[in-house]
């Protein structure tokens, strides 16, 4: 795995990672990680797909991990979409391109999928954050705080056991100095505001897409990805009993193997 930096249009440096397959690559994959985490937490996933013949790339979102930017502090999500667009230009080759987004990264990837930016050949959306179980009073409070005290920092409220049934996953998450667990009120308001916008726009997706979700996900509940199931060319698979980070569950090999087979089948059809 090699690391480098991508310099953005607004003069930020984003940490990038590259996992090169040992033999000829069948496709290029761009990983888009979730809220608070960083692309280094996806090392085992990237190695899995590199071993399967995918030239795999990841990057730390702005304000995350080792990338520039105030930690978890944006007021609009189009800046993330713009960063994905820049990364697509950087990693794209003559090979087919797959974008794989998880959780908030799945939300960002969905926003990219319905945009006018050049599209990849395939998408994988893992627990895409198109909705959340947030009570109306809390939504109102987030909106008010986002305007009144936009820089106020609040914890995400995430518990380690929500990520995986393997307790070591949560322990490692909270012990990781590159995981930032507090975001600004401005960011929270932007996140809650863009979720329904993305959910309403999914009909504009025109690229074959695989949606995967854990049936016991309490971070992004399974109902959040249901709108995608009605879109032509989208296949949705829910794993009963699995939690938010299916790639970190005991059944991770089954989940990643399913994704790899789906990708291989659709690459052959392309």
Where are these regions (language model features)?
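N-terminal cap/lid segment of alpha/beta-hydrolase-fold proteins
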Residues: 1-23
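Serine-hydrolase catalytic-loop signature spanning alpha/beta hydrolases and amidase-signature enzymes
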Residues: 34-44, 56
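Catalytic nucleophile-loop/oxyanion-hole region of alpha/beta-hydrolase
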Residues: 36-39, 65-91, 255
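Conserved alpha/beta-hydrolase
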Residues: 46-69
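Short glycine-enriched nucleophile-adjacent loop
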Residues: 106-117, 123
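Short beta-strand/loop motif that positions the catalytic acidic residue
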Residues: 205, 211-213, 217
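Conserved alpha/beta-hydrolase "acid-adjacent" motif
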Residues: 218-224
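Catalytic active-site module of serine/aspartate enzymes centered on a nucleophile-bearing elbow/loop
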Residues: 235-270
